[in-house]
């Protein structure tokens, strides 16, 4: 438990001790004699909240090693103090340890055993234990310290007892001392005269003990190579014999020696009993789960289960609402109860009260100080929680907007990734060229119309003057035609009349009066027009030079 976490509590205790000493420093006799707190000398003054907060010791900066946690504790001191007090609470010793089924580490195991699909169908293969390594057993002695010294002791009895406790070594068939094979009988030599029997030898003297080992060694050497003769090395006999079978070596005496001399040492690897050789296991493979604690499939299952539970609750609520009777009796509630329920804050600190305590009793200075500090702490915690709630809502809104933007960008990128064929490209280019040409033509027509409207609005009189000047130029160029005009018109009219008369003699006979009247009317109209033209011609001739100059001036830019 860290010491700096107790500093705020120690400072609070010091402040309370100082306040108690100030209150108890008054005259005890005066306090005992007075029955009420109405006098100004005995009744202490209730300090304000600012004074109480000013008397609190400064909060030392918390250095947990994590910059994020340090910044959080500095920005939210009330919540930081709650977290520190919660960490100091001995929850495991009072409430007990958390069970394994509730711990996420135990639930998210990384090793998964995959069993075989059909264990009986697979071939049963006997598991072979690896052979023991005697060299490893011999080298498995503990390392001796550098200053290790053996005590001086008499090892005679111990060695004798050890040799007596040793297990018997495996018996190896010895070839030493074997009886020599009987050689083939040699041919009998010639008969010789029998020698007289020798006299009985005197009893041999006892051989001293020192000469017995030499005699035994000589006998062993004499009997060692007696079997090395040609008769024993018969090829046909050796091939017909079976190879000698030796008992397997027993390495257990090494472990026995190790247990005898070093009782506290871990014994070497012991060979498994014959009955423990089991068959092959049904586990086909062992897989390792990835580092992700919860996969997407598990999250989807959890989400679907939660949604189903919510739907079930909603259906139950709707069913309960439908079963509400027509007549519902409400218990009468007072306005005070409703007001108290509405004014309950987010965090409510209930002070321990007793039934016999009088509500009108005067509170001591320490109680008032504690209540004021608790109220200030409550307001601070509520304000910090509201700030955190607003920040969480703002971040949730920003994340939603960012996800919408990301989805929009993804949709745009997906539409742009579609490949276009050559025909699509040609159609798009043709459409672009056609639209460009139509746009140019429409703009050109608009410009012409605008220019024509501008010209007509700007100079309507100049257009009339231009038309009149053109007419005057034509009249000036052909004055003789104007003079000869009436005669030529009469001749032309007479020629046309004659042609018509020739084409329609019947019409001439039927309506001679109509033809004469028509001819007389036309002649009179022509005679009336000709004097007016002749009178206007001199005036036109005089005005023509002025009109030509005006036309030239208007046409020049």
Curated annotation (Swiss-Prot):
<feature type="compositionally biased region" description="Pro residues">
    <location>
        <begin position="186"/>
        <end position="206"/>
    </location>
</feature>
<comment type="function">
    <text>Required for proper assembly of the eggshell.</text>
</comment>
<feature type="region of interest" description="Disordered">
    <location>
        <begin position="186"/>
        <end position="210"/>
    </location>
</feature>
<dbReference type="GO" id="GO:0005576">
    <property type="term" value="C:extracellular region"/>
</dbReference>
<feature type="repeat" description="3">
    <location>
        <begin position="510"/>
        <end position="535"/>
    </location>
</feature>
<feature type="region of interest" description="3 X 26 AA tandem repeats of Q-[SG]-P-M-[MT]-M-[EQ]-Q-R-Q-[WS]-[SA]-E-D-Q-A-K-[IM]-Q-Q-[NS]-P-[QM]-[QMV]-[IM]-Q">
    <location>
        <begin position="458"/>
        <end position="535"/>
    </location>
</feature>
<keyword id="KW-0964">Secreted</keyword>
<dbReference type="GO" id="GO:0005213">
    <property type="term" value="F:structural constituent of egg chorion"/>
</dbReference>
<feature type="repeat" description="1">
    <location>
        <begin position="458"/>
        <end position="483"/>
    </location>
</feature>
<feature type="region of interest" description="Disordered">
    <location>
        <begin position="485"/>
        <end position="534"/>
    </location>
</feature>
<feature type="signal peptide">
    <location>
        <begin position="1"/>
        <end position="21"/>
    </location>
</feature>
<dbReference type="Pfam" id="PF04625">
    <property type="entry name" value="DEC-1_N"/>
</dbReference>
<dbReference type="GO" id="GO:0007306">
    <property type="term" value="P:egg chorion assembly"/>
</dbReference>
<dbReference type="GO" id="GO:0007304">
    <property type="term" value="P:chorion-containing eggshell formation"/>
</dbReference>
<feature type="region of interest" description="Disordered">
    <location>
        <begin position="23"/>
        <end position="60"/>
    </location>
</feature>
<dbReference type="Pfam" id="PF04624">
    <property type="entry name" value="Dec-1"/>
</dbReference>
<feature type="repeat" description="2">
    <location>
        <begin position="484"/>
        <end position="509"/>
    </location>
</feature>
<dbReference type="InterPro" id="IPR006719">
    <property type="entry name" value="DEC-1_N"/>
</dbReference>
<dbReference type="GO" id="GO:0042600">
    <property type="term" value="C:egg chorion"/>
</dbReference>
<feature type="compositionally biased region" description="Low complexity">
    <location>
        <begin position="501"/>
        <end position="519"/>
    </location>
</feature>
<keyword id="KW-0677">Repeat</keyword>
<protein>
    <recommendedName>
        <fullName>Defective chorion protein</fullName>
    </recommendedName>
</protein>
<keyword id="KW-0732">Signal</keyword>
<dbReference type="InterPro" id="IPR006718">
    <property type="entry name" value="DEC-1_REPEAT"/>
</dbReference>
């Amino acid at each position: 438990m860290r010491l700096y976490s107790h500093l705020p509590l120690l400072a609070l205790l010091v402040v309370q001790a100082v306040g108690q000493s100030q209150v108890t420093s008054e005259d005890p006799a005066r306090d005992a004699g007075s029955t009420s707190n109405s006098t100004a000398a005995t009744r202490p003054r209730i300090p304000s909240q600012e004074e109480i907060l000013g008397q609190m010791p400064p909060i030392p900066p918390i250095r947990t090693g994590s910059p994020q946690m340090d910044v959080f504790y500095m920005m939210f001191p009330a919540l930081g103090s709650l977290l520190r007090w919660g960490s100091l609470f001995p929850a495991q010793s009072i409430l007990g340890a958390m069970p394994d089924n509730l711990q996420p580490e135990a639930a998210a195991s990384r090793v998964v055993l995959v069993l075989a699909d059909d264990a009986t169908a697979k071939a049963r293969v006997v598991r072979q234990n690896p052979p023991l390594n005697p060299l490893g057993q011999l080298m498995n002695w503990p390392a001796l310290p550098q200053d290790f010294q053996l005590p001086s002791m008499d090892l005679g009895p111990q060695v004798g007892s050890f040799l007596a406790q040793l297990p018997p070594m495996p018996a190896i068939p010895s070839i030493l001392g074997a009886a020599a094979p009987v050689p083939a009988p040699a041919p009998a030599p010639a008969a010789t005269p029998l020698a007289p029997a020798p006299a009985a030898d005197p009893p041999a003297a006892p051989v001293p003990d020192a000469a017995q080992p030499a005699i035994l060694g000589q006998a062993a050497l004499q009997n060692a190579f007696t079997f090395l003769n040609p008769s024993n090395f018969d090829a046909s006999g050796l091939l017909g014999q079976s190879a000698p079978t030796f008992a397997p070596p027993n390495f257990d005496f090494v472990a026995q020696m190790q247990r005898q001399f070093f009782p506290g040492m871990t014994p070497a690897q012991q060979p498994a009993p014959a009955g423990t050789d089991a068959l092959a296991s049904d586990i086909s493979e062992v897989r390792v789960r990835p580092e992700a604690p919860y996969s997407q499939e598990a999250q989807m299952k959890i989400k679907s289960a939660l949604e189903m539970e919510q739907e079930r609750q909603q259906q139950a609520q709707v069913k309960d609402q439908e079963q509400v009777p027509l007549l519902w009796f409400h218990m009468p509630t007072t306005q005070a109860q409703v007001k108290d329920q509405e004014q309950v804050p987010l965090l409510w600190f209930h002070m321990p009260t007793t039934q016999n305590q009088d509500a009108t009793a005067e509170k001591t200075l320490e109680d008032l100080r504690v209540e004021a500090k608790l109220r200030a702490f409550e307001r601070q915690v509520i304000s910090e929680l509201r700030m955190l709630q607003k920040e969480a809502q703002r971040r949730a809104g920003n994340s939603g907007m960012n996800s919408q933007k990301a989805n929009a960008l993804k949709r745009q990128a997906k539409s742009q990734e579609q490949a276009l064929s050559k025909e699509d490209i040609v159609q798009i280019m043709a459409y672009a060229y056609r639209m460009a040409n139509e746009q140019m033509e429409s703009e050109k027509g608009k410009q012409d119309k605008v220019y024509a409207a501008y010209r007509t609005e700007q100079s309507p009189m100049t257009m009339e003057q231009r038309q009149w000047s053109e007419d005057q130029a034509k009249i000036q160029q052909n004055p003789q035609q104007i003079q000869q005009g009436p005669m030529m018109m009469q001749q032309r009219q007479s020629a046309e009349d004659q042609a018509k008369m020739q084409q329609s003699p019947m019409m001439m006979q039927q309506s001679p009066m109509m033809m004469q009247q028509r001819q007389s009317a036309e002649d009179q109209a022509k005679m009336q027009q000709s004097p007016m033209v002749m009178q206007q011609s001199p005036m036109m001739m005089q005005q023509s030079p002025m009109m030509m100059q005006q036309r030239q001036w208007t046409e020049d830019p």
